Structures are given as C-alpha cells and as structure tokens.
Amino acid sequence: MVKKRINALIEQKKSFLCVGLDPDVQKIPTLFLRMQDPITEFTKSVVNATSDIAIAYKPNFAFYEALGLKGLHALDALIHHLPKNVVTIADAKRADIGNTSRLYATAFFETWGFDAVTVPPYMGYDSIEPFLSYKEKLTLILCLTSNSGSRDFEERRLEGGKLLYEAVLEKALEWNQFENIGLVVGANRAEELKRLRALAQGLCFLIPGVGAQGGSLEDSVRYGADANAQSALINIGRAVIYPDGEFSSIDDFEKAVAKKADEYVAAMRLALEQSAV
C-alpha cells in the first residue's frame, strides 16, 4: 500500500519532500538546452540531486504533453530513472465518466506505472471508482487547492451550510474503504489545512503551494502531518528545481539543487521538532 510506503520513507529520511518535476523550457538552465534531449537530462539531474532526501516525485503531465511525443519520451525516460523506493505521483487531474476513467486509471497505474494520481472529484463517485479499484495505489482527490481561483467553487457554501471542500472531505472518508485515498490541500490555506487534518483522520495529504505560491513550510508540517508526524507530502517544485545562478556544468547545477532541497528538508525537521514541544 502506497500510504504505508510514504510513512516508512518519512520515518527513514526524516523528510516530507515531494519534488515537483515541471520542466519549463523558458527556465531550464542554458547548459541543458544545448543537449540533444534537454528535458530528460534536466529532470534526471534534479532526481540525482535530491533522491537521498526526497520521498516522492510529482511530474505535472501538462509540462510533458505540451511538447508532444518528445515530452512523452522524456517522461518515460524520467520514470525509468527514478529510484525504485520513492513514490511516484502523476499530477494529471483526470476523471471522467466511468468507462473513460477506467482507461485513465489503466494509463497511469499500469501503462505508466505510477504509484499515485491526482483526480478532481466533481463528477462524483463513478468517475473516481476506477482509480480506487487499484487497492495498492493512491488516489489523491483535489479538496482545497492552492490557486486563488479555488474560492470560486471550493469555498462555496452548499445547502445545509457545508463548504464544498468540506463535502469533498466527507465523501473521501466515505469512499475510503481500501484506505487508498488522499487529499490535495494547499499550503497557503493554513487555517483550513489545520481544520481538514483534524477531520481527515489518517488520510495522506499532498500539500502544494510552498515556495513560489507563498505557502508556509512550517504551517504545512505543523498542520499537514497527522498525529504520528506522518501522512504528508509537501510538494516543492520551482523553488528547488530552478536555483538561481548560471551553471557551467551539470555537477554545479546538481549541487545547487541539492543545496536548496537540503535547506527545505532542514526547515521541515526544525518545524517538526518545534511542533512536538
């Protein structure tokens, strides 16, 4: 079960770090752009620099699909390069009518071989069930996301007084018969994160929004982890994979990425110590 693997890795590495692998050709260092396959070499270098402290990697499919077959080949090369013991998350946000979702689930869990996938819940149970039928995988349901537009719908009050994201949590708990559901909750929503954790029992949280989106790392650790200081994946993308500076060699780049990742994990460990006091 993926959740057990996540918690074992948290315990082993003393880290909640999930690295967002979102290769943007406008931001990739020049030294990679001179190579035959810039995306593959860039993402491999990020993995090489972070694999000792990262517990998960989350490629966002849009960054690869936008490049057509070249991007999909790069994604395939990345998947084969990832260490076997880390957790892999397809950030694809796919769900549809049952038969289509069944094929999406097959694609992400079997064809691509991911451990987890992000899905929107708003088409209801029949759009989610095909993912949940993979009992050993993890389905991460969008609950309260980090973008400013989330207020347009996720914070709408429903009849009866519940907010939409609260109804999503309620359904996630109801559907979680195989203990293979997690939630996506933004790091920049500290009070809501705290409240959702109190209600969510032991559900695993994927927490984006730290760094470039302004979320607090300390709050993400304090409020996102469960009572056992587990069940949280704190995603950091741009702030780690695009360190400042010009790089004359892959080694220089990897050292800079490793330094940024180390700084974040050190801050996670400190926040964990402080929250335990």
Kindly give the residue locations of the regions a language model identified:
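Conserved anion-binding
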Residues: 25, 30, 96-184, 202
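A C-terminal functional module that forms or caps the active site or interfaces directly
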Residues: 187-235, 239-240
